[in-house]
Amino acid sequence: MTTELLSDEQIATALQDLPDWTRSGDEISRTVQAESFPAAIALVDRVAEAAERAGHHPDIDIRWRTVTFTLSTHSAGGLTGRDIDLARQIDELAR
């Protein structure tokens, strides 16, 4: 997917298909409640592998069994298709 900045309309449309994600300025985030701390770490590991393959990395905050993923394309100065693509992958991995 492209690294061109998405318009507000494009972001809103994409988020309709990503109901667990919320936008705050130039980033989107999702919090996942895992069954346990080891399950949270396993999820982070799966997301890390997907992020490496995509060459695009989320900010990750781990607090016991609660994991928050935040996406933004810092080099572009906001949200791009790469963020939406990785959000979709994170959703699949978090199921």
Curated annotation (Swiss-Prot):
It holds the Pfam family Pterin_4a. It catalyses: (4aS,6R)-4a-hydroxy-L-erythro-5,6,7,8-tetrahydrobiopterin = (6R)-L-erythro-6,7-dihydrobiopterin + H2O. Its EC number is 4.2.1.96. It is an enzyme of class 4 (lyase). Keywords: Lyase. GO terms for molecular function: 4-alpha-hydroxytetrahydrobiopterin dehydratase activity. The keyword Ribosomal protein does not apply. This is Putative pterin-4-alpha-carbinolamine dehydratase. It comes from Nocardia farcinica (strain IFM 10152). The lineage of its organism: Bacteria, Bacillati, Actinomycetota, Actinomycetes, Mycobacteriales.
